[in-house]
């Protein structure tokens, strides 16, 4: 929108993200033609977009996610961090399917990363499973935000 003064629909944006989106440089820059509406004239417009442009757009949110992964590791017990280092990190959710997310996190954490077999469904299934155990969880079992606040305060 900002770079090309062009408006595209959510479906088109999702298609571009899935097709050529990346957070780590691809071996070859991918290009996709996008159709939308010119914000200056209101007329239809076509524009070629590259994976390098998308990587630049995703840089800040990707960095924030990696920083959160590092923060969780820092706040976790040594035993848990050792288990994660031994077994690796499994990425879930739609965003992890962006090209290179596993490489980026692995590079920053120095821990091997893999993408779950069905990353889109894993988050929902995991939430459902956690509800089955909610009554048996102890207070603070997964309260990392509280630990972070205590550490900063």
Which residue ranges define each predicted feature?
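Residue-level signature of catalytic and energy-coupling elements of molecular machines
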Residues: 16, 69, 91, 127
């Amino acid at each position: 929108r900002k770079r090309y003064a062009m408006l595209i629909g959510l479906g088109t944006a999702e298609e571009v993200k899935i097709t050529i989106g990346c957070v780590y440089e691809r071996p070859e820059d991918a290009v996709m033609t996008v159709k939308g509406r010119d914000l200056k004239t209101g007329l239809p417009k076509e524009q070629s977009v590259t994976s390098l442009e998308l990587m630049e757009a995703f840089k800040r949110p990707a960095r924030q996610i990696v920083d959160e992964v590092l923060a969780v590791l820092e706040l976790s017990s040594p035993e848990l961090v050792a288990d994660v280092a031994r077994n690796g990190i499994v990425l879930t959710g739609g965003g992890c399917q962006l090209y290179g997310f596993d490489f980026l996190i692995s590079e920053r954490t120095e821990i091997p990363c893999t993408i779950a077999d069905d990353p889109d469904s894993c988050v929902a299934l995991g939430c459902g499973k956690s509800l089955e155990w909610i009554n048996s969880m102890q207070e603070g079992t997964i309260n990392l935000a509280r630990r972070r606040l205590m550490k900063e305060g």
